[in-house]
């Protein structure tokens, strides 16, 4: 009986742990992010304000401000679930927030850990 209970508990724990891991997103360095977005099927999402975006952004990024109350609705109706979403913000905080929201909806997400500031500091190409 004890073995059955322990076995059942182990299966439940494995299932819970597996689900938690599949619900995660990856935070990438500038170099790893640059490699990831070289894949043209990856959608680049900038979650800063429109003013920040216009001042400069990563090439081919689309802009949906995570601080807008309608972010979740706009993102889930705009972004296809079949694509990996590469998120950036200014420094990395807002992109993590956006990543958590999108992961809850089943998206595969990567985010730029150091944000747009890290991208610029590394001398990477920007668009204005």
For each predicted feature, which ranges?
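Structural scaffold elements adjacent to functional motifs in cytosolic proteins
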Residues: 44-46
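Repetitive helical segments and hydrophobic/amphipathic motifs
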Residues: 12-13
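Rhodanese-like catalytic fold shared by cysteine-dependent sulfurtransferases
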Residues: 2-7, 16-42, 51-84, 93-128
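Short, surface-exposed ligand- or partner-binding patches at beta-edge/loop junctions that are enriched
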Residues: 88
